Amino acid sequence: MVDEIRAALAAVADPEKAAPMQAYMKSAMPNLGVQKPARLAVLRPVLQRHRLPDRETWEDTVRMLWDGVSYREERYAATDLARHRAYAEWATDPRSLDLYDHLIVAGAWWDHVDEVAIKLVGPLLAAHPDQVAPVLRRWARDPDRWRRRTTVICQIGLRDTTDTALLADCVLANIDDPDFFLRKGIGWALREHVKSDPAWVRAFTTAYRARLSPLSLREATRTLP
């Protein structure tokens, strides 16, 4: 499957788009120039032809595609495989958190981390809060900024099922950090929660107005009614 995915992506490579895409990501890793619609279109038949037999094979395949990367789109494809509907049961298995941690730390940039955080870690947290929340609280204080950003943004999309105590803990663990991606992530997570509970966001931003960075505060309150 891995070789077929790489070949399928290479077959639709667009050199004219590759350089601008790489420049946008500010990454040393080259791009093939395959945008998301084309990537999903070529992946669909490959994933339909190959059905992985068990969770271990699924994880091994995701890791193989991710770790053997030559082009950025191959890692996007690894994430697509990880969150494919055929493997939803394995994706929300608590054992998969170690895989997601690997993708976060090895990916180490916002495009990879945000997808893993919101599309994989968030649903896993929703499925197994008692097992996942303690890990996220540890990550919120980890030296790795991408683990910390994950804890802040992973509940985006959970709406009414958001664990606001966990969200507050993860935000407060990083509220004084000057890192742009943490400050932006805090504002984004709070702004998204406005859609479900504006009163909670208003109370939180009022209570911590003096500590929230101007960027976080501006983003968090931008859509408050």
PLM regions with names:
Residues 1-225:
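Alpha-helical scaffold domains
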